[in-house]
């Protein structure tokens, strides 16, 4: 029988740190855990966000077309050293990472997601429009469901380690046979995932009103188990965090 623990934030972070310490011993190259390439158009004027060691970072949004010609509107964070003269309407090709961070709103901690730009590529050298490759650990029990139209879906929260003892917590969605594959996986399983980053509008009811919100997630196209088990997988332990304030800063 699985043992379920409702953990505090500290417990949750300490469990994830087990993965990080194990990867340190294995001399993991964290850059390979999270690789994202996008090509699209800047649609908002960049605005100042924050500074790290004197380096300013700006936020804007990029419009990325799907093969269906629908578009995903994704938030990006970019250093002033890369931003240069970028403006609304400019086409850009980005290499970076999909990251999470914590934002305090109305005294509540909110999970925020952004594309962190590490490099701007020449447009003619970036044939990929939207592709992400991740290596990470399941940190909440997958949620499997079937839509009214009979489509199978599974939601996963993936902890992806990066340097300096930080982790990103990324929502992923699997479809069809991939959903069936992940539905019985355990917390602590290490996965390799490829897919695309998407935006999705949904309605949230507040009182008598419904407002439109936007979710950002990874739509999985390929998924497999990585080649080594983790301590949590071996212990058959499920961690249920009580809040979302476990998110690392950018």
Model-derived regions: residue spans:
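N-terminal amphipathic/basic-hydrophobic helices that include classical n-h-c signal peptides
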Residues: 1-25
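Single-stranded nucleic acid-binding surfaces, predominantly the OB-fold ssDNA-binding core
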Residues: 16-250
